[in-house]
Amino acid sequence: MRERFDRFLHEKNCMTDLLAKLEAKTGVNRSFIALGVIGLVALYLVFGYGASLLCNLIGFGYPAYISMKAIESPNKDDDTQWLTYWVVYGVFSIAEFFSDLFLSWLPFYYMLKCGFLLWCMAPSPANGAEMLYRRIIRPIFLRHESQVDSVVKDVKDKAKETADAISKEVKKATVNLLGDVKKST
């Protein structure tokens, strides 16, 4: 685990470049710097004001950036990985909406939530998002796919009917308004 962490800290990216500069200036090993930052973030998630914002930035910011890079890359495997993350993130967000009133009062909630989101986005083929999707979300989706498709089609048809009716009324009102303007001139 430590070797993987060290390898990760020596990959070429903007974060590791910053760690390398800090390591060179301070003489402190980048592993210790990274662990210190992780510790400070964890403490902030427990005690800090705006912990929910920080947690949501971590759960959204990095995955959004990497998702855009995945879309622009020719490799499609990373697209699937990040689409899976976003499906799990969406399901989690909906579940959290209904339980947030209770969960946000728990000590360590935002640290646990952040840990959960980091586990879901972990750079491994068997990360949390993949496991949750494969074991929970996908079976439920496949079991109810036809009913959901039917509801989506009905809603889409009703929305189209409503949009057409509104468009027709707007056209009629425009014609009447233009007729009234023409009569008054």
Curated annotation (Swiss-Prot):
GO cellular component, one term: endoplasmic reticulum tubular network
All ranges on the Cytoplasmic side of the membrane: 1-30, 71-80, 120-185
Primary subcellular site in the record, as a coarse category: endoplasmic reticulum
Region (Required for dimerization and maintaining endoplasmic reticulum morphology): 110-181
Transmembrane segments: 31-47, 50-70, 81-99, 102-119
GO BP term, example: endoplasmic reticulum membrane organization
Membrane topology summary: Multi-pass membrane protein
Recorded phenotype for the gene knockout or disruption: RNAi-mediated knockdown in the heart of P10 neonatal mice causes lethal cardiac dysfunction at 4 weeks. Myocardium is disorganized with greater fibrotic regions with significant collagen deposition in the ventricular myocardium. Mice show significant myocardial dilatation and cardiac contractile dysfunction. Also, sarcomere organization is disordered and the sarcoplasmic reticulum membrane forms vacuoles. Myocardium has elevated expression levels of ER stress marker Hspa5/Grp78, cleaved Casp12, Rtn4, Atl3 and Ckap4.
Keyword NAD: no
Pfam families registered for this protein in UniProt: TB2_DP1_HVA22
Ranges in the topological domain labelled Lumenal: 48-49, 100-101
Protein purpose: Plays an essential role in heart function and development by regulating the organization and function of the sarcoplasmic reticulum in cardiomyocytes.
Complex and partners: Monomer (heart including ventricles). Homodimer (atria, kidney, intestine); maybe disulfide-linked. Homotrimer (heart, ventricle, skeletal muscle, liver). Interacts with ATL1. Interacts with ATL2. Interacts with ATL3. Interacts with CKAP4. Interacts with RTN4 (isoforms A and B). Interacts with ZFYVE27.
Entry note about domains: The short lumenal loops between transmembrane domains 1 and 2 and between transmembrane domains 3 and 4 may impart a wedge-like configuration, thus deforming membranes.
Protein name, entry field: Receptor expression-enhancing protein 5
Organism: Mus musculus (Mouse)
